[in-house]
């Protein structure tokens, strides 16, 4: 299961991580976000030790999503070595996400 990240823990958990980090930006009211949750949780289990998978509620943590220009959710961002590497917007299929992650890291 993916852990939560907040505005205050983002720097330590994402930018200073030794592992690549996948961040799922979501909100409670977002239907596609809820559909993506089990996919993100499966990816978190499958890539454990290879990629850190985190979730950020944009309503509870508005600063980081604003800083990264997030305008639609779900938005999935991949970070490596403290830098944003790539972004996917909208509901994604598990296999396409895994391919994207593996190509990006």
UniProtKB/Swiss-Prot annotation:
Annotated Gene Ontology cellular component terms: cytoplasm
Superkingdom of this protein's organism: Bacteria
Alphabetized UniProt keyword annotations: Disulfide bond, Electron transport, Redox-active center, Transport
Disulphide bonds in the chain: 30-33
A GO term for molecular function: protein-disulfide reductase activity
Domain annotation Thioredoxin: ranges: 1-105
Pfam families documented for this protein: Thioredoxin (PF00085)
Signal peptide extent: none
InterPro entries registered for this protein in UniProt: Thioredoxin, Thioredoxin-like_sf, Thioredoxin_CS, Thioredoxin_domain
Physiological role: Component of the thioredoxin-thioredoxin reductase system. Participates in various redox reactions through the reversible oxidation of its active center dithiol to a disulfide and catalyzes dithiol-disulfide exchange reactions.
UniProt-listed PANTHER family: GEO12009P1
Family: Belongs to the thioredoxin family.
Protein name in the entry: Thioredoxin
Organism: Rickettsia felis (strain ATCC VR-1525 / URRWXCal2)
Encoding gene, per UniProt annotation: trxA
